Every structure is written in C-alpha cells, then in structure tokens.
C-alpha cells in the first residue's frame, strides 16, 4: 500500500497485473486468479475510477451459468481460461467478491444503471457447479455460453450476480450452510469437499443478498423502471416458497433442477421480473441466512466468552469451540458475520473480546488467522500440515486482519478497528521485527517476519478501510458522505485530513475537531467547500459534487 500511494495509477495497474509473477521461489508459477481480478479493482476505484466501469463489465464474462466461474485470467481484459491444470475445482467464496466491487463502484459513482449493462457467460465442460461434465460440449463451440439458437447469450450484470448468489443459497450441506467444496478464501481448507460447509462465507452471501436488494430499489427509484429482464431459467431459483429454506433436501432439488436446465445451452428467453418482488425475495433469503447463523452457530468457552463457529469439516462436525485439546477459533467466521450484519451488537462486542483473548499476538503484528488446533486435521484442509504460525495455519494473515478491521469500523467499533490496523502497521513499519521494507506482506510468520510482501488484496482493503471507514470519506450512490471514525489521538492540533479522487474530482477533506472528541462522540455538523459554507450536513449531494472544481478543499466541522 505504501508503494502504491507513491506511484502513478498506471504504474500501480502494471504492478497489480504482474503481482503474482514475482520471484518468490515457493509462491507458485504466477498468474492472476479470480479474487485478484475483483480486489485489484477496489483500489483502482479509489485511484483511477474511470478505467473501472468497462473492466467490471468484462470481468463478469468469467461467470458460468451455474454460478461458478473461470479460475484463470488470460492476458487480455475479459479473457478467461478453463480449469487450473485441467483439474475441476470450485471455490465457494468466488461468487461473493464481484458484488462487493460492484457495490463500491455504484456507491462511489451513483451509476446504478450499471446493473443492466450486459455481457456473455463463460462456458467449458464444467457444469452443475463442478460435479458433472458437459459431454456434448467441444472446443469448436467456444468459451461463451450459447442459447438454443446457437447464438452467444448475453445477460445483465444484475443477472450475473443473481445467478452467483442464488445458486450458492441453495448449494447447502447437512447443516444448511453453503458447501465448502474445493475451499473458500482460505485455499488451505481443501479437504472437506464432501461434507464441509463455510458458515463464514454463507454470512457474506447473506449480507450481499440484502444489499443487492437495496441496489435494485435504488435502480428502480432512479430510472422509474419497475421491472428488470432476467433469463427465464432464473424463475426456478426465484419462485420458491420460503418454507423450503429450512428444508435441505428440497433446496438441493431446486438447485439440481436449475443446473440440469442450464447444463448445455439455455433457452435464450427472458422474462420481466418486478423489482419490488425481487427485492422481497432477496431480503427474505438474506434474513433467513442471518437468523439461521445466529441461532445455530454461536459458541462459547467455559468463561462464557463467545464467537461464531465458521466451518464444518468433512466429518460433519463443527470446527470451532471449546475442545479437550483447547480452544479452536478462526478469524474468518468472525469477520464476515460482523461485516454482513449477521452478528448483533452484543455479539460484536463478544467477538472482539474473544479475538483479543485467543487470536491477538502483539509480537507478530496482531490477530492470527486461527488458534493452534494441535492436530493435522485431514478432514478439513492441508493448512494443518503447516507448522502453527506459518501460512494459513495461525499466521497473522494481512488480508483477513484488514477485513476484520473493516468489519469493526463498519459496525462503529472504531477503537477495536484501529487496534487491528495499528498493530499491523507498527509491526511492518519496524524493519528489525518484520525484516521487510514498510508495506503489507501476505502474512507475518511465527518469528515475526513479513512474508511475500506484494499482495493487492490486503492493500486494496487497507486503502478502503482507512479512507472509507477510518476517515469516513465514502460514496452514497454518487453523493459524498463524510462519516469519520478517527480516534482522538489521530488528530494533530485538532485536525486530520485525507486526499483522494472522488467522481473525477481531486478532493482534500479536512476534519476540525476543536473539542477533542473521540470517535463515537462526534459527527459532521457543517461542511465548507473552498471556504464557502455548503450546509449544516454531512453529505455533499451528487449533483453538487459534479459541479465542483477539479481540485477542491472541503472542511468538515465535528461536534
């Protein structure tokens, strides 16, 4: 992140593009993956947003009609290549990331019409979410999904995201959480394909469903369009009675019926779906997920301190809790239950306490990815073959730690969020401890050394967290919302400022905290633009943002 701030955006883009081809001998052969594609765009949205719109549209071309996606990105924008090493593998988290980037884009720009932009779908032999092969497909048919008339089918961005989320919603295991399959964000959880479930990412999908409903409502209000066009096949996933949500076998039947229908070609027919009805369906799905996790996955230790179980293993057992060998806690399940508003405020407080108790280690820069399971857990993943404190087995993993900070700020817990960021910063800024130049490594090892220090996912989330959450400079459907959560000690002489691009304007926002108030005690009461009072408010309307000079100074009074 420190390097990127000092670079031009084009240099940053080059660094992003080649990030996984750097000369670490044990890091792999290089090349970008699906998550890289979307998370690199997060940072670009802040630094050079005009590039991003078409890039996002092109990226959606990697989605399959069964909700999975191509896992290797070609050298050209929008180019996708089939299975890694010709091995079929499905990462269950992949469907969630495109929405997060698209949501940030729409909030920054107000471009909700982006939802109805169109692109094709990726096609290869992999069908039924990686469980079957399309035996009548061949290379001559190309890598784009065809309709029955042999024409390439194109659907909206909204349709792509709906397919990703709806198929995941029905793809559940025996505890009614989304199946882990080949792994989730944690690639090391790769040995529970049959019975594994990811409660952590089920929470994220649930939060996305509810936020997508808000976006559809905003689209309908802005455009006056009461309906959206969707592929006819999606009705299989939408026209389902809510009572089915509790019944695992029936959910699987819904998914199987859909996957069988879209196995080779699709009809090409589209139907109008009412926006209000679609929003209601998505809300009900998101609400169901949240309630299901809250009522089934909360676990506590002997002292009554609690957190969420984030996974089920290949034996069908909950992974986290108070075990005879010790406490088993993983950070991922806490991050996404907090971020997706699944956790109640009381649960957020409890999670932060438990994370401090079991995961925090100041000597290595903060919050570990997990506690020591004291077992090579072959019914969950290869990560347990690493020594504890290395790689995915209990290291301080910068990406997840940064997302933990983001989730805490999102819920208004600024002191707790700042502790995460500051612990990581102080460690990595100290060469004698981290052994690297200042920056964000992939992880911090048991010895405190920063490892693999070119990671754009962590860097993107650090930019987002510091700018959008800590400094509170964020978009609200194109309007400029100022909602800082800076601690009292972060102000110098009562002032704190940040400079960034917003809707094509180079803005510097300066907060004045003359009363030395702490985060949670103040809000923005007045806004001044280039010395002139704008209003007694915390938001600059989109139409007024567009009228601003190319470079502008904004002063916000806190009280």
Which residue ranges define each predicted feature?
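Acidic, mature catalytic/reactive cores of soluble proteins
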Residues: 1-559
